Amino acid sequence: MPVPPPPAPPPPPTFALANTEKPTLNKTEQAGRNALLSDISKGKKLKKTVTNDRSAPILDKPKGAGAGGGGGGFGGGGGFGGGGGGGGGGSFGGGGPPGLGGLFQAGMPKLRSTANRDNDSGGSRPPLLPPGGRSTSAKPFSPPSGPGRFPVPSPGHRSGPPEPQRNRMPPPRPDVGSKPDSIPPPVPSTPRPIQSSPHNRGSPPVPGGPRQPSPGPTPPPFPGNRGTALGGGSIRQSPLSSSSPFSNRPPLPPTPSRALDDKPPPPPPPVGNRPSIHREAVPPPPPQNNKPPVPSTPRPSASSQAPPPPPPPSRPGPPPLPPSSSGNDETPRLPQRNLSLSSSTPPLPSPGRSGPLPPPPSERPPPPVRDPPGRSGPLPPPPPVSRNGSTSRALPATPQLPSRSGVDSPRSGPRPPLPPDRPSAGAPPPPPPSTSIRNGFQDSPCEDEWESRFYFHPISDLPPPEPYVQTTKSYPSKLARNESRSGSNRRERGAPPLPPIPR
């Protein structure tokens, strides 16, 4: 141990010397070493960084420069929406930029909506475009309707319904939320996918039918709203208002007024026809609660319109979705569930349409059972959702109506049978029963079984603890470590302090 200390001392003197020498020797070199720093401080060598913000240019290009391209691209979107969409998109070239915005909105709904508004309609109407962007589905929707209507709806959006669409802007945001379910069409197609996906899955011809009818009859825009792009429903409402010539217009005014009264609700009423409403108007549903009659009114108006009368019955199911909003507390949850279940929900509706509607009713009783084993919390609401989807898709949803009943309770007016169904279903109560049932199945049966298996021993049965004796405890391992480390380290470390003394 004594040997190591001597070598240690020499390094300290060297370090000390180095420290003392550095200032003197490096004074000349300091300039060279610090040249970069000094230059930076002076700002001579600094170059301004050039940033390429492609986000804004991209938005601008599709909107303005890419208008033609936008039309073409949107034509593709239209094709997705319907066969005639391609032609419609091409004819819509002028509005193409907003369409592009709508397509892009999946990524950045807010920015695109604002940009679309500014570029297309100017200060006041930008909101229309954003909804339009989302409801660019309107463009796809209008493609089915036809290029002529296309331009008309777009002007309508810009001119008449900007406020309603603005009001609906919030619903489009829900659409954004719903977009995850159907992102590619996110804005327009989101509602469509929701509706179309349910309808397309269950009966794609149905959506196609409404869309095709929409091109043919003047009401089609409104039917289109239901069938083609309820997501674009807000847009279509505006288009409907814009296309006031259509008989739909009178019903539309109520929707705009609703939009004015409750911005979110108006989109739901048109969208209310489809489950997409929940996605689009997840927030709106609560307003719908405020205006359940309004949603029902849209339904009557929708039903009143000739082309979709059969769809309206099927859509009554979706009205239940708005009714889902009927549960103020549950409204967001149901919409959310619809969103989460949207993909799943459409399949159920499709089966419902296909004709296993009875199974959905049968499922209803099982749902509580399934729910207890399955997802205790969410499933019960999802069953309603699935029921809503299936019911919405299938007219014979009378059994489903019970599920609706809870959902539609606010809107029971339109369908008297619903009230009895509601009492039977007791929509809000059923979830609690389901929860209780879950608790019963999961908890009560389990608890009974476990309780029967196990019981607490009385303290008398337990053996007394050993008496506690205080004793000093030595841990040799700890001592050895401390001694070896402390002794050796102290000795080794002790040497270095000596070098300072030679200084």
UniProtKB/Swiss-Prot annotation:
Residues 21-31 have a biased composition (Polar residues). Residues 1-503 are annotated as: Disordered. SMART domains: WH2. Residues 1-14, 141-154, 161-174, 182-191, 204-223, 282-298, 306-323, 346-371, 413-434 have a biased composition (Pro residues). This is WAS/WASL-interacting protein family member 1. Residues 65-104 have a biased composition (Gly residues). It is linked to Wiskott-Aldrich syndrome 2: An immunodeficiency disorder characterized by eczema, thrombocytopenia, recurrent infections, defective T-cell proliferation, and impaired natural killer cell function. Disulfide bonds: none annotated. XRSGPXPPXP motif repeats lie at residues 352-361, 374-383, 410-419. InterPro entries: PH-like_dom_sf, WAS/WASL-interacting_domain, WH2_dom. The modification Omega-N-methylarginine is found at residues 125, 134. Residues 45-48 are annotated as: Binds actin. It comes from Homo sapiens. Recruited to PIP5K-induced vesicle surfaces in the absence of functional WASL. Plays a role in the reorganization of the actin cytoskeleton. Contributes with NCK1 and GRB2 in the recruitment and activation of WASL. May participate in regulating the subcellular localization of WASL, resulting in the disassembly of stress fibers in favor of filopodia formation. Plays a role in the formation of cell ruffles. Plays an important role in the intracellular motility of vaccinia virus by functioning as an adapter for recruiting WASL to vaccinia virus. Highly expressed in peripheral blood mononuclear cells, spleen, placenta, small intestine, colon and thymus. Lower expression in ovary, heart, brain, lung, liver, skeletal muscle, kidney, pancreas, prostate and testis. GO terms for molecular function: actin binding; cytoskeletal anchor activity; profilin binding; protein folding chaperone; SH3 domain binding. The modification Phosphothreonine is found at residue 345. Belongs to the verprolin family. Binds to WAS within the N-terminal region 170, at a site distinct from the CDC42-binding site. GO terms for biological process: actin filament-based movement; actin polymerization or depolymerization; protein-containing complex assembly; response to other organism. The lineage of its organism: Eukaryota, Metazoa, Chordata, Craniata, Vertebrata. Binds to WAS, profilin and actin. Binds to WASL. Interacts with DBNL. Interacts with FNBP1L (via the SH3 domain). Residues 121-137, 238-247 have a biased composition (Low complexity). The modification Phosphoserine is found at residues 142, 234, 340, 350. Residues 32-49 form the WH2 domain. Residues 480-494 have a biased composition (Basic and acidic residues). It holds the Pfam family WH2.
